[in-house]
């Protein structure tokens, strides 16, 4: 269910303060955050935000196409390595 337009996008205050401070200083350092739920807003364009995935911070460079999406969408939490190989298919067949 989408968020109501009258409420506007949700961005954690501490994250928005860090982005605004870097915009004022014209600084482009990496911003670490655990806020995967924050929506990407136009003020974040050009910044690299390191989003926590539960184990480490994944750097995400924000561009125009990402506006309106959540930060967590660009930092996967699960790694799929494929299903296990069938032990019988490799060598001998059953008789």
UniProtKB/Swiss-Prot annotation:
Residues 73-95 are annotated as: Disordered. Keywords: Ribonucleoprotein, Ribosomal protein, RNA-binding, rRNA-binding. SUPFAM superfamilies: Ribosomal protein S19. GO terms for biological process: ribosomal small subunit assembly; translation. This is Small ribosomal subunit protein uS19. HAMAP family: Ribosomal_uS19 (MF_00531). Protein S19 forms a complex with S13 that binds strongly to the 16S ribosomal RNA. It comes from Deinococcus deserti (strain DSM 17065 / CIP 109153 / LMG 22923 / VCD115). The lineage of its organism: Bacteria, Thermotogati, Deinococcota, Deinococci, Deinococcales. InterPro entries: Ribosomal_uS19 (IPR002222), Ribosomal_uS19_bac-type (IPR005732), Ribosomal_uS19_CS (IPR020934), Ribosomal_uS19_SF (IPR023575). Belongs to the universal ribosomal protein uS19 family. The keyword Ribonucleoprotein applies. One of its GO terms (cellular component) is small ribosomal subunit. One of its GO terms (molecular function) is structural constituent of ribosome.
